[in-house]
A protein has these predicted regions:
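Solvent-exposed soluble domains appended to multi-pass membrane proteins
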Residues: 1-315
């Protein structure tokens, strides 16, 4: 497990999604076919699918996911409209059950499976006028903050239970399976950072602590027993703090895989610059202002390679 430093707060989820699935630092228009890790796994013979239980046109995912090389993009219109959970859409447990169905069916047909899913349960905004359940003591918080935080934590509890059940299922699944689980951004809990301020959480972006509190998101790389045996790894311990575009690198480095040429190239970049954010870079383990980088030439080259890889399909 470790942390990713994203570049969004309270919304804009596709930024984190697309950094991960492409490995890109800067995005192309996605109006035509582009290289991605989905396409990479497809080239390795995997069935590659994306899932998100809300409408497919949201954030133009219908078009973009096709450009990224997914065989199918399952969304509200073509799969998940049978569910009526959080906000009228599938809960995490229902989404996970659909992932499992596709995993089992694909493996049964003799194929490997790569799935990129985005959950919806516990998406904000959170009820602020009514308290559903209480998880923290009221230390003279405003009613709005107290209600919002507790209602958010209720959603976290439900999502955690669904994730635990998915882990438990995978641990007993015969085929070697790895799950990378991460958040997109920290939650919007009301006006600005008011609720965070009441909780005593430093969100001052001029400080490293505040910057990390604002943009840091946990990730987990989980493997079932079959995968642990194949890779001779226990999948425990703390990994690096990185940008989301390096998450696939982190997995491949851990299991000893090189990946394609782009992944190998970005792994070299990662050795020097493991966090890339408009405010700070993390260079050789130390945060430095993005305007004062010691590796600006490397960043400039990365942008050029990024552009070339995005616009030249490896067919």
């Amino acid at each position: 497990h470790g942390s990713i430093i994203v570049d969004i707060f309270g919304g804009g989820t596709v930024s984190t999604e697309r950094h991960f699935i492409t490995g890109f630092y800067e995005f192309p228009s996605f109006r035509r076919e582009t290289n991605s890790y989905a396409r990479y796994f497809k080239e390795q013979g995997y069935v590659v699918e994306a899932m998100h239980p809300i409408y497919g046109a949201f954030y133009n995912r219908n078009t973009v996911n096709a450009s990224l090389g997914f065989d199918a993009y399952w969304n509200y219109e073509n799969r998940f409209n049978i569910y009526n959970g959080w906000g009228g859409y599938a809960n995490d447990s229902e989404l996970y059950s659909e992932i499992v169905k596709s995993l089992e069916e694909t493996n049964k047909n003799g194929n490997h499976y790569f799935n990129f899913s985005v959950t919806y349960q516990n998406h904000g905004p959170y009820e602020s006028n009514t308290l559903i359940e209480s998880y923290i003591k009221n230390k003279e918080y405003s009613d709005v903050t107290f209600n919002t935080i507790n209602n958010y934590l209720k959603g976290i509890k439900d999502s955690n239970e669904a994730l635990y059940n998915l882990f438990e299922y995978l641990d007993n699944y015969d085929e070697p399976t790895i799950l990378i689980f991460f958040g997109d951004h920290n939650p919007y809990l009301g006006d600005g950072t008011y609720a965070y301020d009441e909780l005593g959480i430093n969100m001052d972006l001029s400080t490293i602590e505040g910057f990390e509190n604002y943009y840091s998101i946990p990730y987990v790389i989980h493997a079932n027993e079959s995968a642990k045996e194949i890779f001779d790894k226990d999948f425990t311990g703390e990994l690096d703090t990185i940008s989301p575009n390096y998450l696939m690198n982190e997995l491949f480095e851990y299991i000893g895989y090189e990946g394609n040429e782009y992944l190998k190239y970005t792994s070299e970049i990662k050795k020097q610059i493991d966090v890339i954010n408009p405010i700070y870079y993390k260079e050789e383990g130390e945060y430095i202002s993005s305007s004062n980088s010691n590796y600006q030439n490397m960043i400039d080259e990365f942008i050029k390679v990024n552009y070339y890889w995005a616009n030249n399909i490896n067919k």
